[in-house]
Structures are given as structure tokens and as C-alpha cells.
Amino acid sequence: MSVPSATAVPGGRANVRRGSRAAGRERPAGSSATAGYFFVALYVGLLGLLGVAPVVYAIYLALSNSRGFGSSFVDAFDDYRFVPAFEHILAFMLIWLVAQTILVVGLTLMLHNLAQRVGAVFRFLFYIPGALAGAASVVVWLFMLDPTASPFAFVLHWLGYAQFNNAIAPGNLAPIFAVMAFWTGAGGWIVVMYGALNNIPHELLESAEIDGANAFKTAWWIKLPLIRKWIVYMLVLSFAGGTQLFVEPTVLGSAALGVGVSKYWSPNQLAWFVASQYDNFAEAAALSVVLLGLGLLVAAILVWRGRLFEAE
């Protein structure tokens, strides 16, 4: 009777060891689910505390007025500063959103056609200004707009601005704030758009090149449609942030000692002004609700027209 010989499997023992280590590294499914529930609960809790609750309270303040239901909105609409504040913010956002959309998408498409290392260097350079956000960015621009201290003083003098107050004349404020917003925010969106372009299958781009499509046709007919949702996403967040413009005109107005920049240039500033100077929290809440409604309306239109949540 012959005894069957054991056949050695090359690397079998090593495979067993690797398998045992892999099994040891596996986490129970319950722990992953618990962690997921924890982070979702944390997000929902913070959203309710810092997002939903203030909105509900603002609506309550705006509607509960001793002079009658909705009188706070009437006061806000009748305020002589209401229309100019919204004209300012709409002019600013029109300049900023159009310029940001065209330049961010254009620069991203250009960087995507460059060599990997060269594109990485430019993405980093574009992203650097985003590190100076808020008041820090405005302080930088205080020097940039001062003809006596700016490194671009020759440009300011060429435009006819001999003093700081000339540069920040009321008619220049909307473009100035648009440049500030683009300076701090464009780099981050370029990185986001570049990541979206990298998700396009390389085979699709090769097929277009084989079919004779040049760089412009590839960008227009293939790349842009495939990153359309990211462009809409950028517009939604940018519009929501733009309606809340506050720091830039406040700091710039303080530096100019109130000359050229009013204390209620933007609706957000106006809401703060009536609340802090007149203790009229109901009107301030009404202005906040108007800004919220405007943001939600524009976001809904962009999401609907851009088919942001449709599966492809």
C-alpha cells in the first residue's frame, strides 16, 4: 500500500502567514458602522445647533414684532439703505462670478494640458493666495491699493489714482472686492476642477485625439460637459458666500476712516449696523432671512438647471 506523498505548495506557508495577518487586520463590520453613525450624528448635531437653530430663531425674530406680523420685513424694505446695499452686492457678484467661472475653468483646462510637473507647480502657485483669507487678505490689499506703498504703484498712477482714497472711490468698490474674492478663492477651485478633469477616462481623450479633435474641441465637447456639475457646485457655494460679504468692506472702510466705504455697503453690513447701533434685531433678522431666501432660490435654480443631483 503506497502512502500518498504530500505535495509542497510554493510559498504556501508564507501565504498562510499573510492570510492570517490580513485576517488579523480586518475590522469587525460593527465598528465601521458605529464610526459612521458617530460622524453622521456629530455632523447633524452641529448642523442643527449652528445652522438650523439660528435660521429658525432669525425667522421667529423677523416675524414676531409687537407692531404686527411681518412688519420687520416692511421696515427692512423701507430702509433707504436697503436698495443700495443689494445693488452693491449684486454688482460685486456679477463681476466676481462671471470672472471666476471663466478664469477658473480656463486656467484649469490650460493646466490640464501641461506636463504633470509644470501643472503641479502652477496649481501650487495659484493656491498660495488662499492661505491669506478674510482680514489677512484685506490687509495685503490695503498695501496693494495704496499708490504710495504698492508694488504696482505705476499702474495706479496710470489709472489716475494718486492717493489711497482715490483708489477706493465708491465706483471702484465692487470690482475691488471681486478681485479680492477671486484672489483668495480661485486657487482652491482650480485644484477641485483639476481633480474633476483627472477623473475623465484617458481612453476617451485618446479617442478624441485619434478622431482629429484639437485641444479646443476636446475641451469644449468633452471636458466641459463632464465637469459641468462641478462648475454648478462652484457657483452655488460662491453665490452663498458672496451674499455674506462683510469682512472686506468693513476692514477697508476702517482703513479709509470711513471715506468712500460706508458702514452698510453690503446687506450683511446693514444687518449688523441696525442690530448693533439701533438694537433693531427684528429688522436685522428680516435682512438675514431675505439673504437666506435669495441664496436658496438661486441655489435651487442652479441645481435644477445644472442637473446637479441627477445620476449619469
Across the structure, where does each feature detected by a protein language model lie?
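Short, Lys/Arg-rich, polar N-terminal cytosolic tail immediately upstream
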Residues: 1-31
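A structural signal for multi-pass alpha-helical bundles of membrane permease subunits
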Residues: 32-312
